[in-house]
C-alpha cells in the first residue's frame, strides 16, 4: 500500500508468495494476516546534515564474546530531527487518501513501533516525534528514516518529509509503504519449529 494504491508483491518488488499460503491452508494449517510499514529512503546529498543533531557511533562496540580478534569498526554518523506541527498538519490533510484511515488497511500492525501516520492519529496530544536519519552504509547515498514508517500517498510523504528540520530539499529515492503478509499460527508448531500437521516441514 502506497496511499490507496495497492498490488500483490513481496518486499521491494519481489515476487508474491500468496500461492504458498494457499497451499499451507489446503494442507490444514491456519494462517492469519499481519502488517508492517517501511520508511521513505532519502538521497543523502539532499539532506542538510549541518542543521541536525549528530548522533556519533560508539568508538568500540561491545562484543558478544571475549574470544577472537578485535575487528576494525567503521561507524556511521546518524542525525536526529523531529516532526512538528506542520508535519502533522500535512498528514491530516491527506487522511482521505490514507489506507489506514480509510479502513482498506485493517490488519494488525506492529505493537511497539507504529507508523508515523498512526502516531499522529493515536497521540494527537504529542507535538513532536523524534526521527533518526541513518545512512544505509558509510559510502551509500541512501538514508533510512527511523521512526517514520508510513503507508501515506507519495505526495503526503514528500510534503511531510520536507517539513522536517534539515530535510527542506530532501529527495525521496523510494517511498515508504505498508505490506500485509500471512503468518502461520505458531501454536501449530513444535518448539523446534516443525509443523505438527506436516512432518518434516519447518517454518
Named regions from a protein language model:
Residues 1-203:
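Residues forming the flavin
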Amino acid at each position: 500500500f502506497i496511499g490507496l494504491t495497492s498490488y500483490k508483491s513481496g518486499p521491494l518488488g519481489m515476487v508474491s508468495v500468496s500461492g504458498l499460503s494457499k497451499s499451507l491452508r489446503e494442507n490444514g494449517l491456519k494462517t492469519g494476516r499481519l502488517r508492517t510499514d517501511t520508511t521513505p529512503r532519502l538521497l543523502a546529498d539532499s539532506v542538510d546534515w549541518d542543521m541536525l543533531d549528530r548522533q556519533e557511533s560508539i568508538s568500540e562496540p561491545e562484543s558478544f564474546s571475549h574470544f577472537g580478534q578485535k575487528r576494525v569498526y567503521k561507524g556511521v554518523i546518524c542525525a536526529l530531527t523531529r516532526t512538528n506541527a506542520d508535519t502533522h498538519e500535512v498528514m491530516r490533510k491527506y487522511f482521505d487518501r490514507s489506507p489506514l484511515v480509510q479502513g482498506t488497511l485493517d490488519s494488525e500492525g506492529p505493537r511497539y513501533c507504529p507508523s508515523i501516520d498512526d502516531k499522529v492519529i493515536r497521540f494527537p496530544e504529542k507535538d513532536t516525534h523524534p526521527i533518526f536519519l541513518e545512512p544505509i552504509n558509510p559510502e551509500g547515498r541512501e538514508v533510512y528514516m527511523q521512526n517514520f514508517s508510513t503507508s501515506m500517498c507519495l505526495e503526503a510523504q514528500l510534503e511531510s518529509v520536507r517539513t522536517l528540520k534539515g530535510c527542506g530539499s530532501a529527495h525521496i529515492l523510494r517511498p515508504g509503504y505498508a505490506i500485509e503478509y500471512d503468518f502461520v499460527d505458531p501454536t501449530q508448531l513444535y518448539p523446534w519449529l516443525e509443523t505438527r500437521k506436516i512432518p518434516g516441514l519447518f517454518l
